[in-house]
Amino acid sequence: PTGVGKTELVKVLSQELFDNVEPLIRLDMSEFMEKHSVSRIIGSPPGYVGYEEGGQLTEQVRRRPYSIVLLDEIEKAHPDVLNILLQILDEGKITDAQGRVVSFENTIIVMTSNAGSQIREGSLGFTKSGVQMAREKAEKALADFLRPEFLARVDEVIVFRPLSQEDFQGIARLMIEELKPALLENGIRFDCQPEALEQIAKAAFGHTRG
């Protein structure tokens, strides 16, 4: 589902692994919906505009081999772009348009998708059957646009559930804690009671938009 913290989770992973979010390489796959988008991944061929610049993905990984690659909304990528990504997953490397071999052996590749987000909330429970049903529907939705050989090279599929109001309270608490140091520097001490957190979460809560 959308708005459940998929991207935020990847940022936290980068922070935990590298102590900052700089090694996070994020590509919005909605920008790679056309056939010619392949050149933006590995670079333009010789004689074409942008040849010297390298690919948006390969050049960043070449310069920062220890990184996390986030491919956001993978379902929007053109099939030719998916073929390039399949080669990366299969061989752990890719040759860019300038003939340089770029290794992905030290990268973590994360792909997010809203596949299966049309599943109604009522079918997503905490029971084993509810969780299993959600996984099966999500995997079926993934199979609608990803070839079997692509899915076979994915180490793990993580299914997110919609956030509850309790989750929103936890998020509000974390965001307020992050705000406190900045307020304290300005001589403001800020405390938030549980009742206030509950009201903040209630005002922000949304089943579909996150």
Where are these regions (language model features)?
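AAA+ P-loop NTPase nucleotide-binding core of proteostasis motors
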Residues: 1-210
